[in-house]
């Protein structure tokens, strides 16, 4: 008799066990009607929350948009409140400087979820423009200071140009009287930074700062909060030089206030593009910018203070016989001269502060920036 193959018997036993296991699995998986039951799945709640902007001027609005999955109800918390639809959009107001947090909380059968969006509110905005200087692109910065409670109106613009060695942010933080005027809603302040902390008036740098100024105007021109028909410029020392240069080479400024610097001889030779009003201030003991003209700081050849004002007046068709008066600015006596009767209701003023050097500090009884702003307003056509 042939020998029985034990391996064959073993295989048969294994197959029987496997078939029994499969049958048991199928039986346990069947529903009452004989069909296969669904295997339970965990559908977790999902929120997609987005915003139209990541930063916004305070009191202005942004749009929030959201969609959800696997949720039954939603509500808002943080800097917005109330029940929310499962998908939708909402305009929300930015009410404070810094982070404004908008949180959406949703509940579903398989749990809860919360998603937040932070929107930065600001009154100071730092912006960058690229400019070609010496064949290479350079970042040029400027700061915009808005009122604390901006309205929907368009605001006049006042540019403030720092002196040599300064920057826009420093100038913004230096004059509390300017901030007060801005927060009262009189105007929006723009504080540019000079390339290498200087303005190119007499070849101080390779930058074209008139072009930089025009680039700023172009950059902000689409925003209706800026009234580009009322643009003014204030400059201190080296900043006065660029204010005079912009005033001569463009027609954007409606008024300028060059402080402790008059026109250079080269700028004086330029025929102005437009007509504007001038509020010029000099100290009679200025050792950097000589009041009587000549070579001064950075080997710059200045006109005299009176000659600079007369140059403006002559170009603007003013009466060339100025009115004279004596004023008191704090502890300082001031000789004031006014050329009136200029084209388009403009006026040219210059002030010589006695016993004063290269400074605009004349004591606490006088606020120069309030005087300048009142002068600008008085010349509006």
Regions found by a protein language model. Give the residues of each.
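Proline-enriched interdomain boundary motifs that mark the N-terminal boundary
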Residues: 42-51
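Solvent-exposed segments in extracellular or luminal domains encompassing
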Residues: 84-101
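C-terminal catalytic histidine-bearing segment of alpha/beta-hydrolase fold enzymes
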Residues: 277-281, 303, 313-381
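Serine-hydrolase catalytic machinery in alpha/beta-hydrolase-like enzymes
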Residues: 133-146, 152-232, 241-245, 362-366
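C-terminal motif of bacterial Sec signal peptides marking the signal peptidase cleavage site
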Residues: 28-29
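A domain-start/cap signature at the N-terminus of enzymes
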Residues: 35-40, 88, 118-157, 205, ...
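The conserved beta1-alpha1 loop
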Residues: 159-163, 260, 282-283, 354
